Every structure is written in structure tokens, then in C-alpha cells.
């Protein structure tokens, strides 16, 4: 969490392009849809980037610019106001911003004069109008169904990601209305809605048939976690006279779902509303309606890298439906999402053969065993062979299954030598070339078509996990930016962890970062050459380590950090993206190019020089990242025209001895000098941190 707090601090200053919401959030394969994006700092957007294949888009030219005449007044008056200080994290209409300012004055006695209030409202409304960007998105007829990430890029840089769903159902757009004039739809379909006004309600009229099991599945929170601050959707199912038959306001956390069996032929109406009657341009939803499955898993839930996956979807309301799917697995091993016509499912992808049923001969290890417990008490047994040391890892909850798989390995003599249960892992030595028995069962003897599992038995290796944040990095030509890399050493990892970037665009480079064995956070520096051309491109961050069992290599999971109720939160993304845009307004450097020498009881001043250029005269916020755990340096603001600040590296009360007694043979701890304006975060590079020559003398004085 410390890393989240640190990164959130820098994000609060850097006003990078941000997509808070867009409408609609999806389209049918083979169609083109106009999408409205709302957010902050989106003016000048000219590129649309989508993950995967089959989804392309063009940003429409135009869009208003922010009138920043009264931005300094807003910063002065609203910098400490929770409701008004972070417009980049919210999407509200111009009228809603005006009402919020007046409410803060009226209810909280905010010290804002009527004249200043008008100016602040003018700035916020200008930002709201400029946050509107329109793009046309084309979905190819053969585009795989599922969830895609969309980003845009502006002269300021690359934006945060927003989710976009490709479906194979007819799509409609919901509008504000009344019960008596409910919108006629034909099931199955997907409805796209947005509540921009307070008190807005959407009504959908359909024909139901006796005995038909219909599902109404609304997606909002699952597409945008920040929506919980302003959108709590509610579903109500009504008969033709308006009598309530079913209601739900939260099945997938805040996303409602109704599973209903129609009692008789007739007309029925589904009502969609907000629990508190609120409206917001970011209150956007997609609503799947019809005879559709949910809580689904893919059977078998495992595939070999790059191979075709021929299986079927199981879950609730799948009886009588044709749910066969045939998709291709990605080339990267690990847990991944695969899109199907019935929703996205989690699948484990492995480089080893996948076995889906017991075979008459022994299975040569390594291998993956995948299937489902179709009936209560069902047990599967496999004969396996292959001497060596192996990891046994089980997957059930992680693939969306209600099962708790238990894997028991029996020796040639029938005695139990290893077992794992649930989403767990264990190591075992198979010393004999004789056959062993793998027994798979559901831990509580339950069963059903959706009780899927997979168990991988692979050569033992060190286990390493890694995340990288932020997921979107913007560079200026000739400058650098830092990416925080957090590692978790699970099993058998020893020594340094090397972190590097792969697939960077031409003109962008990075040096390998080393995370010593006594640290779990490092900073990867990306640098754009002085002549780097404008570009927006995904890339990968990879961490590598060694252990007694060999080498571990893992791709870092990209994370976007955002604020919810002023607390930093992280959401996983599928790609890291780097952009080269704009020009340098400033640089920063240490006045003394020497190691930072820390002391356990007193502060160490660190002078930082600010070099301004191209007429830039705004605020620059300066900080040090990656200090040893017993020291901290408060960030400093270099106001307009200021060209030097001093950071105080001081003890924070934690035990300094682990660092003071640190083995000199370990790789040094590197601090990162970072500085940012409203538009850009700049990293100076790594600076070694060492103990001062007289550091331990201060501790002697305590005695």
C-alpha cells in the first residue's frame, strides 16, 4: 500500500489525459458505432488505441479547449476540497459542477465569494465541456467477442484505459422515458444506457412466454469501478400493469442481475434507475437481456499456448442452449480472459499438454489435467510418470468455478505423498520411474456442470509475481519517466531481480533495473531520445530472477492507480502503453551528482535545480522515490519562477539498523528524483543511497 500512496501522490499533480466514461460501452461485431468519451485533458485527442484485433477507431476532429484563466483561483480556493479538487477523476455536466460549487458554499461554508464562485464554476464548466471527445469505432465481423481496452492520445500524452465490449447480439440505446411509453425491444439484445439527468429512468417492454427463463444482467461497476461514487443501478421487473415482479440492486457487487422464469405469455417491462435518483455522464451501463447464461466457466478451463480451444460454456441458465466455442489461446502462459458469445471466462494457458480425460496409459509429466466434476462425489484418477522435482498447482476459484478442487498424489505403493486443495501450490519429488496416481475430487463432494478445475504438474521453478504502475507512460523527447515495479518473491527466488522493458518503440530506451534481495520495489526508467518521433505503442515489462530450481521470468501486470474517496486504488490492465508527445517545459537535476548520505537521527538536505524552458513558469513538484524504509523526504513545490528547492531526507521513526548494517556486497538502493508539472512527470534517474560516514555515531549519542 505504501507504493500505492506514493504513486497516487504523483498522479494527483500530473494532469494526464484521463477517460472517466464513454458511451456506449460496446458494439455488435460487424458494426460501426459513434462513441462519446468523457474525462479530463482530452482536448486535441487524435489517436484511438485498442487491445486485441478486430476493433479500430478514429477520433473525430474538433472539441473545445479548457479556459484556464481561473484555474489558479480554483487551485487556491478548492485545493483542499474533496468534492472540487479532483475534476480529472470525475465526469459531471456543466450544471452539476455549478450545483456542487454552490452546495460546498451553502452546506460547508466554503470561504468563496459570489464573484470567485462564478469564476470557479466557469473554469470547471469549461473543463467539463472540453472533456467531450467523439470517436467512431468499427468492429470487424470476425472480431472475437469479449472485453477490449480503449485509450486515446492527445498532445499531452496517452490516456488511461476504458473498457469496450464486443457482442454478437442486437444492440439498442436506452432513453429517458415513462412507464406508459416504454421502449419496445425484442429479446435477446443488449441495451446501452446513460443517466445524465437526476431522476432519469429507462423502460424496456418485451414479450415473455410461459416457462421461459430470462436473465437481465447489468454491467456498470464491472466496467468502471469509480462509478460506485455516483451510480448504484437498480433493476425492477414489472408486469404490464406496473406491478413489481422482481427487483435487484446488487448481484456482482453493485451490478444488479435478475434471473426470472416467465409465469405466462404476456407483456412485461424492465425498469432501470439509480438507487438515489442521481444522474452523471459517467453513469453508463450495458444490459444483457434474454435467455442467456451467467456465472459461466469454460470446460475444459485450460489450453496449451497458441492452440485452438474447443470446449463449451457451462453455468447458470445454460440448459438447452448451444454453448460450444472454438477460440485460439494466446501465446503467453498464465491465467487469461477469453471472450465467448456468452461472456468472458478465465482460462489457464500452459506450455504443457492438456489432458481432459483419464487415459489407458500413463501420462508423461509435465502436463495439465482439466475438466469438471459433473456430479456430486465424482472422482477422476490419472496414472502419471516422470521422475524429477515438480510443482503441483490447482485452479478452481481463479477460473470462476464454484468448485474447491483437491489434488492428491499417491506413490507407487499407494501411500499419499502430496496434496493441494483449492487455489494452492505444493512441491514434490518423484524419485521413482514407476507410475504414480493423481486423484482429483471436489473437496466437499459437490458437483455440477459448472464445477470446473485444472491442475498443472510442472517442473519445479522459482515463483515470482510482479506489477508495474502506472500502465500509461508519457515521455517528452529527450526526457525520462519512472515506472514503479513491485515484486513478490513467492518461492525459491534468490539474489537480485532484474527488470527490463521489451517491445519499446524506436527512439525509446530503458536500462535494466536491479531490485536487491532485501527490497521489493524498484523503478524502471524509460527515456525518449531527443529526436524521438511522436508514437503511441504497447510494450512489456519483464522481471527475471534465479533460484536453486532455475530461472523465473514473469511479465509485470500493468496497474492503473486512481483515487476513490481520496484513497488510492489499483485496477489491473492488460497492457503497458508508452507515448512520446509534446516538448520539454522543464528538467530537474541534483545540484550535487553524488550519493545521498542518510543519518539515523538528523536530516540530509538534497538540493534540486529546476531548468525552465519554452516560457514555462508554472509550479513544479519535486520528490524522491525509493528511499530506504527508515527515511522519507517530503515533496516540495517550486512555485512560478523558482529554480531551486531543497528536499530534507529525514528519519521517519522506523528502525534504521537494517539499512545501516546492510551487506555492502548487495546491489545499492537507488532513489529516483522525480518532478512534475500539471502536464508531465519527469524522472532524473537513479541516485545511490548510502549511510553517512558518521551515521552510527548519532546512535551512540542516544545511549
Name these PLM-found stretches.
Residues 54-64, 130, 468, 505-519, ...:
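Low-complexity "stalk/linker" and mucin-like segments enriched in Ser/Thr/Pro/Ala/Gly
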Residues 74-85, 120, 124:
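The canonical Cys-X-X-Cys-His
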Amino acid at each position: 500500500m505504501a507504493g500505492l500512496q506514493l504513486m497516487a501522490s504523483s498522479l494527483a499533480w500530473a494532469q494526464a489525459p484521463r477517460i472517466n466514461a464513454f458511451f456506449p460501452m460496446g458494439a455488435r461485431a460487424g458494426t460501426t458505432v459513434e462513441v462519446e468519451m468523457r474525462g479530463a485533458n482530452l482536448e486535441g485527442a487524435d489517436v484511438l488505441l485498442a487491445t486485441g484485433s478486430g476493433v479500430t477507431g478514429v477520433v473525430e476532429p474538433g472539441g473545445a479547449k479548457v479556459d484556464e484563466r481561473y484555474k489558479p483561483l480554483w487551485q487556491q480556493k478548492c485545493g483542499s476540497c474533496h468534492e472540487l479538487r479532483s475534476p480529472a477523476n470525475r465526469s459531471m455536466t456543466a450544471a452539476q459542477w455549478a450545483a456542487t460549487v454552490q452546495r460546498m458554499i451553502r452546506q460547508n461554508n466554503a470561504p468563496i465569494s459570489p464573484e470567485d464562485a462564478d469564476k470557479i464554476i466557469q473554469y470547471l464548466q469549461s473543463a467539463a465541456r472540453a472533456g467531450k471527445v467523439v470517436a467512431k469505432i468499427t468492429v470487424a465481423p470476425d472480431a472475437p467477442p469479449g472485453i477490449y481496452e480503449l485509450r486515446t492520445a492527445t498532445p499531452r500524452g496517452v490516456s488511461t484505459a476504458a473498457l469496450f465490449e464486443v457482442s454478437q447480439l442486437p444492440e439498442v440505446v436506452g432513453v429517458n422515458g415513462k412507464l406508459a411509453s416504454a421502449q419496445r425491444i425484442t429479446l435477446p439484445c443488449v441495451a446501452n444506457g446513460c443517466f445524465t439527468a437526476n431522476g432519469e429512468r429507462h423502460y424496456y417492454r418485451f414479450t415473455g412466454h410461459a416457462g421461459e427463463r430470462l436473465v437481465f444482467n447489468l454491467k456498470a461497476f464491472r466496467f468502471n469501478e469509480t462509478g460506485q461514487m455516483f451510480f448504484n443501478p437498480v433493476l425492477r421487473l414489472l408486469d404490464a400493469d406496473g406491478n413489481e415482479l422482481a427487483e435487484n440492486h446488487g448481484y456482482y457487487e453493485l451490478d444488479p442481475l435478475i434471473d426470472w422464469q416467465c409465469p405466462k405469455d404476456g407483456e412485461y417491462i424492465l425498469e432501470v434507475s439509480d438507487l438515489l435518483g442521481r444522474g452523471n455522464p459517467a453513469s453508463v451501463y450495458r444490459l444483457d437481456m434474454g435467455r442467456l447464461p451467467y456465472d459461466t466457466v469454460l470446460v475444459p478451463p485450460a489450453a496449451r499456448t497458441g492452440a485452438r480451444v474447443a470446449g463449451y460454456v457451462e453455468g447458470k441458465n445454460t440448459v438447452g442452449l448451444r454453448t460450444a466455442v472454438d477460440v485460439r489461446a494466446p501465446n503467453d502462459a498464465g491465467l487469461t480472459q477469453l471472450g465467448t458469445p456468452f461472456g468472458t471466462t478465465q482460462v489457464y494457458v500452459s506450455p504443457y499438454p492438456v489432458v481432459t480425460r483419464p487415459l489407458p496409459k500413463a501420462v508423461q509429466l509435465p502436463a495439465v489435467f482439466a475438466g469438471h466434476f459433473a456430479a456430486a462425489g465424482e472422482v477422476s484418477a490419472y496414472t502419471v510418470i516422470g521422475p524429477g522435482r515438480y510443482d503441483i498447482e490447482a485452479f478452481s476459484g481463479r477460473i470462476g468455478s464454484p468448485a474447491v478442487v483437491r489434488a492428491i498424489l499417491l506413490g507407487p505403493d499407494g501411500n499419499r505423498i502430496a496434496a493441494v486443495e483449492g487455489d494452492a501450490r505444493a512441491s514434490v519429488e518423484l524419485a521413482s520411474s514407476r507410475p504414480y496416481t493423481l486423484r482429483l475430487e471436489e473437496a466437499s463432494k459437490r458437483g455440477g456442470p459448472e464445477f470446473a478445475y485444472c491442475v498443472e504438474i510442472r517442473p519445479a521453478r522459482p515463483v515470482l509475481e510482479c506489477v508495474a504502475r502506472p500502465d500509461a507512460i508519457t515521455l517528452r523527447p529527450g526526457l525520462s519517466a519512472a515506472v514503479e515495479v513491485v515484486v513478490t518473491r513467492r518461492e525459491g527466488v534468490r539474489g537480485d531481480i532484474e527488470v527490463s522493458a521489451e517491445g519499446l518503440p524506436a527512439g525509446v530506451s530503458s536500462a535494466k533495473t536491479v531490485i536487491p534481495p532485501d527490497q521489493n520495489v524498484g523503478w524502471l526508467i524509460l527515456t525518449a531520445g531527443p529526436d524521438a518521433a511522436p508514437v503511441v505503442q504497447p510494450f512489456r515489462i519483464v522481471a527475471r530472477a534465479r533460484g536453486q530450481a532455475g530461472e523465473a521470468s514473469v511479465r509485470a501486470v500493468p496497474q492503473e492507480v486512481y483515487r476513490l474517496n481520496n484513497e488510492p486504488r489499483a485496477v489491473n490492465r492488460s497492457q503497458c502503453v508508452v507515448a512520446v508527445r509534446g516538448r520539454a517545459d522543464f528538467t530537474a537535476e541534483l545540484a550535487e551528482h553524488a550519493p545521498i548520505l542518510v543519518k539515523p537521527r538528523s536530516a540530509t538536505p538534497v538540493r534540486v535545480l529546476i531548468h525552465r524552458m519554452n516560457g514555462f513558469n508554472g509550479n513544479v513538484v519535486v520528490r524522491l522515490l525509493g528511499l530506504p524504509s527508515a527515511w522519507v523526504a517530503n515533496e516540495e513545490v517550486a512555485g512560478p519562477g523558482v529554480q531551486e528547492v531543497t528536499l530534507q531526507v529525514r528519519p521517519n521513526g522506523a528502525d534504521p539498523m537494517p539499512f545501516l548494517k546492510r551487506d555492502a556486497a548487495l546491489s545499492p538502493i537507488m532513489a529516483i528524483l522525480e518532478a512534475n508539472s500539471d502536464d508531465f512527470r519527469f524522472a532524473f534517474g537513479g541516485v545511490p543511497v548510502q549511510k553517512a560516514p558518521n551515521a552510527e555515531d548519532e546512535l551512540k549519542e542516544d545511549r
